Structure formats: structure tokens, C-alpha cells
């Protein structure tokens, strides 16, 4: 007889859609353990700017993988999958793991699985890192197009971290990153239910602007100043996120506060648009409007009962 797989709920959607509120609605109905899958909310120095759950929200139920990474470090999809599996498996019997976030690559990697990639030698990592700093993201992307055009369809010329990782794997193994991704992987030990928060981009846009205003009121500028004192390196992974980049430029005197807010809102909207495009391609998502907490909770309850 096939062993019953552990149920795991995934709450996904674009930034600012109301994923945290939905997860807390579930936590008031079921014993829930919330696990982050947002690539920006992992950073210790940016709880306000990356909209991590507040202390009051975290008091409702256990929250995992928020604010644990220094600004100088990064985590790739493989590293996230390992940490997420640890947290899922550590959940107590009867406790429902609920993944919350908007980084589609992380979620896809957890659900679909990743083929095991050999460890990359430190000298290769360091060589690629130096090239990234000296030559810039577009130069790495141009090289990646020659050796792994398939993977280039899923990344962007300015995404230095992902492109550097792909080149590291190719240089270390002699095989494209996409080859490793396409390898057959063992079936997942988890039974996933994907709950999507459905919003229209035009409807979301004014909410994103309001969200930025609230972040500024909550001390986003002061948070960025303190982070810059601790890590005055604009190439550090933690500074590459939206909001962090714009506030860093403001702190350095490159732009005024009005321009900071304008760029922050513009870039957040563009990111939300990319997220919506990603999730539209995902299969088996059950969509609910932001205000439909009760419907989503009821649906999860029925799914668990089945």
C-alpha cells in the first residue's frame, strides 16, 4: 500500500495581494506552521522593507524562514528546498505546513523537485563572482546564452545571482544548468494544495503605493540606513531587492525621497506583473479574491477531510 503523503498548503500570489492575511485566517481555524517562500523576506536587516510578518502576526502561529539571512549572503532554489523540507518534516503531527510567498522558482523547485547537482568547488564560485562584479550581469548572460540557451529563456540579463549559478554549474560539471533541471527526480513525499490570491494588476497598483507609504511610516528609511551602516556594499545580495535598491540610492544622495518612492512603486508594480505572469502558467491553482478568507479556509478544510 502506498504511504499517505503529508498535506502541505501553498498560498501564492503577487506582492501585496494579501497572502499573509489569508495564512493567518487559516491559522485561526487549523493548527498551522507558516513557512516562507519569498526570496526577499529571508533577510534579517529588512523586515519592514520586505514586508515580513509583524511580531503580532507571528504570535498567531509559528513562522519559519523569515529574517534569518545576513545581507552579505544569498540562497538559491536548492538551498531553499532543503530548508523548507526540514521545516515541513519538523512540523508536529496534526500541524498543517502552509507555505506563503511569491517566489515562483522556489515553489516550483519544491513541488517538482530538483535533480541533485554536485557541489561546486569554491575556486569556481569565486572566479564567477569576480567576473560578475567586474564584467556585469549582461556579460555573464551573453556567455550563458552560448552554453545554455534553454535556461536563458527563464532568467534575465540583470539577474546576476541566477546567471552566475548557472555558469558555475556548467563550468564545474560540463553540463548546462537546464540539463540538471530536466533530469528525472523522485516523487514528492508531500501532497500539495495551491491556493492563489487573485488580483487584477490595475486593482493592485494603488494598494502597492499605499503599502510603500505604510512602510515609510513604519521606519523603512531608518531600517535602510542601519543596514547600510552594517553592510555598505551595493553588490551585497540583500541590497538587490526592490525597495532596498531605491532606498540605498536615497541614502547615498543619488535621488530625493519623491524619486525614491516613484521608482519603488514603479519597480514593485513591474515585479507584481512578472509574478502574475508566472502564476498564470502554473497548473492546479485554486484562486480566491483577497477578501475571500473564509472561502479559502473552508476549501482547505474540505481538502484535508478528503
UniProtKB/Swiss-Prot annotation:
The record marks 103, 125 as: Interaction with substrate tRNA. This is tRNA dimethylallyltransferase. Residues 38-41, 161-165 are annotated as: Interaction with substrate tRNA. It catalyses: adenosine(37) in tRNA + dimethylallyl diphosphate = N(6)-dimethylallyladenosine(37) in tRNA + diphosphate. Substrate binds at residues 15-20. One of its GO terms (molecular function) is ATP binding. It comes from the Bacteria. Its EC number is 2.5.1.75. It is an enzyme of class 2 (transferase). The keyword tRNA processing applies. It comes from Maridesulfovibrio salexigens (strain ATCC 14822 / DSM 2638 / NCIMB 8403 / VKM B-1763) (Desulfovibrio salexigens). Keywords: ATP-binding, Magnesium, Nucleotide-binding, Transferase, tRNA processing. ATP binds at residues 13-20. The keyword tRNA processing applies. Belongs to the IPP transferase family. The gene is miaA. Its cofactor is Mg(2+). Catalyzes the transfer of a dimethylallyl group onto the adenine at position 37 in tRNAs that read codons beginning with uridine, leading to the formation of N6-(dimethylallyl)adenosine (i(6)A). Monomer. It holds the Pfam family IPPT.
